[in-house]
Amino acid sequence: SSSAPAVTYAASGDSEMGTAVADYALQFVGNPYVYGGSSLTNGTDCSGFVMSVYANFGVSLPHSSSADRSQGSAVDGLANAQAGDLVCYSGHVALYIGNGQIVHASTAKTGIIVSNADYKKVLAVRRIF
């Protein structure tokens, strides 16, 4: 990896692709939440957000937060999460960006935001890259 300083959320040890996924996802913060949507600019729900972000990297994920829990490989909890990992909750899915934080299409009221990853009980962490 390059020694040039970079402004990023990712910590060392994160995969380059995972970091790229997190950085790409972060540019959509502030955009709207729309149930059933998958547009990163005009409105998406939680799984549509994850699906559309990963589609940019050539990865096809289901438009379903529960189905996302079986994608990729299992990660042993938030303590071992890396940038780009899927963080799965009951009825919800988010992207881990590092430093204990996630980016996600949260609610119609908030839209796409950054939150603490432990804001509710984590069911699974899944690594795609």
Where are these regions (language model features)?
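Catalytic cysteine-centered active-site loop
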Residues: 11, 24-83
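Intrinsically disordered, low-complexity
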Residues: 1-32, 121-129
